[in-house]
Amino acid sequence: MVYYIDPNTGREYSIDPTKRGAVTEPLITGIGNRFDIEEDYLADDEIGVKVKMNTLKDKYEGCLLGLACGDAVGTTVEFKPRGSFAPITDMVGGGPFDLDVGQWTDDTSMALCLAESLLAQNGFDAKDQMDKYLKWYNDGYMSSKGYCFDIGRTVSSALGKYSLHKNPYAGSTEPRTAGNGSIMRLAAIPLYYLSNLEKTIHFAGESSRTTHGAEEAVESAKLFAVLIRMALLGHSKQDILLKNEYYSNMDNVTSFYANHIHDKLNNEKVIR
């Protein structure tokens, strides 16, 4: 028995190569939303002929490793004024936290906390996520240096509120707090909920609200989750970046940036 994933829906089908043209539903049984398969196949190829693509495992690893590698590369110029440095073309470490080559910052630490929470709780659990963020902040959990050496003000404020009131949705709703912290850690949400678009969108927003509750941050997290999901399902870069039917609130995000992007670019003088 072999399997393929329909790139239009993310659904898995089993194929019996001895019965040409026979496609069987429902999907392979798995644990939660983690697919118990090693290969996927083009949906429009002749039934029974295996066409090896990048495996889902490769894509998942690439998504998380790309996040961490980008973080480790970018830390070299974090907080430097735009245009004040030569382009970075390799992973060299250093930066404001004097990191070794390959060490990541708070962004990847929080991404790992979110991923671990989804696996440990078999799904979305806002309280467990905040507990893990606190463990990172207090004990260095998932930190590349063994301790928390940097934390954004918005996240710090949310963790402080959670410590006092135990409401996991502690993110400020003030527009001025709509930073990108909840997007940088987001990848595990579309990875875990790949087979369900509605859950991907919903829990992307909920994952933002724990620390970044401003509408701009929440809606942007939802959109970014959809873009990651489309990439995982094999959509082209052009399709991913075009306005699409998968995310009904695209106009909300577009209007945010149409109204505020120039102000943000003018005000953000340093790399964050």
Q: Model-derived features: where do they sit?
A:
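Structured, active/binding-site neighborhoods that engage oxygen-rich ligands
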Residues: 2-272
